[in-house]
Amino acid sequence: MNDYRRFLTFVFLLMISGSAALAQELMKVAGLVVDQNADPLIGVTVRVQGDNKGGTVTDMDGNFTIHVQKGKTLVFSYLGYKNKEVLANSSKLKITLHEDNKVLDDVVVVGYGVQKKSSVTGAISQVKKEDMENRTITNAKSALQGKTAGVQIVSSSARPGSSPTVRIRGFSSNGSSDPLYVVDGVRLGDISGIDPNDIASMEVLKDAASAAIYGAEAGNGVVLITTKKGTVGSGKITYDFQYAIESLAKKPKLLNAEEYIQYMKEGKTFTEDYLLKNWDGTTNTSWVDAIYGKGKMQKHNLGFTGGNQNGNYYLSLTYLDNDGMVKGSNDLYRRLTATINAEYQIKPWLKVGTTNQIEKYNARSVSEGNEYGSMMAAVLSMDPLTPVAYEGGNLPVHVASALANGKHLLTNAAGNYYGVSAFYAGEQFNPFVMRDNSVSRNSGFNVNGSIYADFKPIKDLVITSRFGYRLSGTRSSSTSLPFYGNATQSRDYVDQSASSSTSIYYQWENFANYMKKLGDHTVNAMVGMSFQESTYDYVQGGLQSNGEDAVKKNNPLFYYLNFASASATKSVGGEKTRSAKYSYFGRLSYDYRNRYYLQASLRADAADLSKLPATNRWGYFPAVSGGWTISEEKFFEPLRDVVTSLKLRASWGQNGSLAALSGYAYSTDMAQGGIYPLVPGNNYTTSVSPSSMGNDKLKWETSEQTDLGIDALLFAGRMNFSMDYFVKKTKDLLVSGTTPSLVIGGTTSPINAGNVSNKGFEFELGWRDNIGDFSYSVRGNLATLKNEVTYLDPSLTRLQGTTFMNVPLTYFEKGYPVYYFRGYQFTGIDPKTGDPTFADLNDSGDLTDDDKMDLGSAIPNFTYGITLTAAYKGFDLAVFGSGASGNKIFNCINRTDFPMVNKMKELFYDDRWTESNPNGSKPRAGANNMDKYATSSAMVYDGSYFKIKQIQLGYSLPRTLLKKVAINNLRLYVSLDDFFTITKYPGFDPEVSTNDVVGMGIDKGGYPTSRKVVMGFNLEF
C-alpha cells in the first residue's frame, strides 16, 4: 500500500514539473507589422509554422499578440506581400513586409476564369484601380483612355453624364464597333452606370484568341470589369469626397462687333445704313462668354468592406451632382449608385456569392451637334450686334413689332426680353431662347448583377452556376413652349410628348474548370453553356396643338399627357421586341514547366429567328494560341541578370457580330399599297406588294485576327515591355442599299457584302523604382493603326455617311479607311476675284462629284498615353497625358448658306482676300462657291493633339497622428484635369465626333470639354 502511494506521489510530482517546464517554454509574443513605408498593415495572418489551424491577425493598428513556444518559427502572410518567417525568441517584434510584385501582378481575369499573367498567350491589357481612383471621370469607359495601347476613346459630347465610345484595335464595321462589356460575368450594353470608384480592375481582351470565348459578341473586342470585393481582416469604413470647378478649356475666336460689321460690308451682305440702323452702337456680345459660366461637380462615396476566412463583403454608395457650364438649370446630371457584393464559403465544397450594381439618374441637357438648330451651334453663329437681353424695356422696332403681333418673346430672370437678331433669321437664334424654349425631363434606372455558386465535388474541379440579370428603364418627357426666335423660327402653342421604355435581360451560365498538375505538365480545361434572353418594351405619346395649347394650362404642373386639351391631336406608339441566344463553349490549356504554353477554344452561338434565318443561325468561333517563355531555357541563364523574363506569343482566332442587324432584317415583308377597281362596279381591291426583298442567306459578321507578341521583364522586374503586331480582317459586313430587282422593285434586305482590314503595332513600356524614401514610376503606350475597306458589293460604288448642309462628307468605299472624308480639293484663292478655286480632276471644266477626292480620315495613325508617378514620404504626385496623331477633323460649325452668321476668325476673317490683300489665303467676304468651300479640304484640319489629362498632388497625414482620433488613413489632394492641350485645331476641342461611326471626326458644335480644378480627400476608419 505504501509503495502504491509512493508511486502516485511520483507521478503527480512528474506531471507538475512537466507542466511547469512547458509553461516556461510557452511565451507571449507581441508586435507590430508594417510595410516598407512604416505604415501598419491590417489583417496580416500570424501563425506558428506547421500549425494551419491556430494563429491570429493584426488589428487596425498593425498590432498582434500570440502565445508560442520559445524557439518556434512565426510565419507572417498577407496578400500582395512576401511571406516572412521569424524565430520567436523575443517578446517584442517589429516586422516589415515587402510587396511581392510578382504576386500583385500575377493574375488577370479572362473569360470564365483567371490565369497567371505569366501563362497568358493572348493580347490582354489590364487597367487597375489605381488608374481610376481620385480622377474626375464619371464614366468607367474614360478610365481606359491613354492607359493601354490599341484602345481609343471617341467622345461626341462632354456634357454632364455623357458616355464616350470605346474602340479596340480600330474600326471593324460599317455599323457599331462597340466592344462587349462583361461586369462580374454579366454582359452589359453600356457601363455608364458603373461608378469607377467601385472597379477593382478592367481587362481588355484585344486579340481574337482572348475574346473568342465570347464568340458572336466579341468581334470588336471585350472589356472585362471586376468590381471590388471585401478583404480578409477587420472591417473598414471609407469616405471619399471630391469637388471640381469647371470652365471652358478653350474659347474659339469669333468676330467682334467691329469685325462683323466690316465683314458684312465687304461681302455686301448688309449695307452700312442697315447695319447702323439696327445696331445700338455699343453692343458687342460674346455669346461664348454669355452662355458659358463656371460648372461644378461634387462626388461623395461611402464604403464598407471586410471579411474573414469564410466570407467577405463590399458595400458602396456614391452620389454624383454635376451642374454643367451652360448657365441656368438645363445642363445637369445627378446620379446615385450602389454596389453590393458578398460571398461566403458555406462548406469546403460550396461557395456562394452575389454582385449587384444599382443606378438611378436624372439629367437635363441642351441641344448640340446639329447644324440645323442646336444651342451649341447658335453660340458660334449668332451675330455680336444682338444683345443677350434688352435692358430697361427699350425694344428695337422688329422686336416691338413681333410683340405687337402676339408673338411669345421669352424673358430672363429680371423680366427683360431676350435679344432677337435683325441680321440672321435661320435655324439658329438666341442661345438663351434655345435653352429655355422647352422643358425636358430625363430619368432612368439600371439594376444589374449576378448570383453564383462554386461547387468543388472533387479535387481540382470547380463547377460554377451563375444567373445574371439586368433591368433598366428610362422615362423622358419634353414640353415645347411658345417662343419667338426670329422671323422663321417661332412657336405659338404648347406641345407635349413623353416616352417610356423598359429592358429586361437575363443570362444563365453553367461551366466547369478543371486543373490538373502532373509533374512538369499542367492542364486546364473549361466547358460550359449559356442562355441569354432580352426583352424591350417601348411606348410613346404626344399632344399636338391645334390653335391652342395642347395641355390645359401652360404651367409646369400640367406638362403631362393626361392634361390634354380638348383640341389636341393625340398620338401613341410603341413596340415590344424579344431576342435570345444559346451557346456552348470550351477551352483547353497546356503548360509545360512554365515554359511552353498552348491554348485552344471554341464557342458555338445560336441566334433566334429575330436575327438570322434558321439555316444560318449557328456560328462557330475557334481560336488557338501559344507561348514560349524563352527566359526559362538553360541557354538564357547568362542574360537573366538583365532580362528577368522574356516570352513570345502567337494567336489566331475568329469572333462575330450582329450589332448592325435589326429585328427580322432577313425576312420578306409585305405592305399595303393603293386601291384599284379590278372588278366591275364600285368595288376596289387593296394592293399588296413586297416592301423588302428578304435574304435567307444572311449570316454573322466575322472577324479573323492574327497576333504576334513579346512580353519582357528587365532589371529584376523594374522595367516591363510588351509589343504586339496584329492583323484583323472583318468579313461579311452587313450592308444595306444594294440594287433591287428591276422587275419586282422594293427595297433590299441587308446582305453580307463588305470586308474591312485593321492592322498595326502596339507598344507598352514601364519603369518603377525607389531611391530610399523616394519612389517613382513611368508608364507609356503607343499604338499604330492602318484601316482599309478591302471589299464592297460590286453594285455599290460607295456608301454615304454623314452630311453637312445636305452634302455627304463621309463615305464607306473599297480602298479607303472606314468612312473617310471625301470632297473637293481646295487649291487656293483667285487673286483677281477673291473666290476659292478647286481642283478639276477630270478636266471637264465644271465641278462635279467626279472631281471629289480623298480628304483624309478621322482615324489616327497612332495613339499614345503616358503616366508619371512619384512619392516621397507622405507626398504623392501623378501626371497623366494622352494624345493622337494623323487624324483629320472636318469643321462643320459655320454655315456658309447663311452668309450673315458670325464667323470664326481663323477660318474666314484672318488673311482673307481684299483689294489691299490680293494674295490672301481665305476667300473674300461674300465670295462665290462658298458652299463648295465649306465642304472642301479647306475645312479639313489636322486633329492631332496631346492633352495633359491630370496633374494631381496629394498628401497623406502621418498614421501616428491619425491613430489618436481613430482614423486609419487621411489623404488630401488637389488636381488640374484637362488643363493643357497642344493642338493646331481651331475649334473647341480636337476630341470631337458625331455620335456614330459614320460621323467620325465631324465637328458640328458638340458640348465642349471643360478644364477642372479639383479638390478632395480620402478618409478611412
Regions found by a protein language model. Give the residues of each.
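Acidic, glycine-rich flexible loop segments
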Residues: 270-283, 299, 372-433, 437-439
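Conserved small-residue
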Residues: 238-280, 367-376, 539-547, 664-665, ...
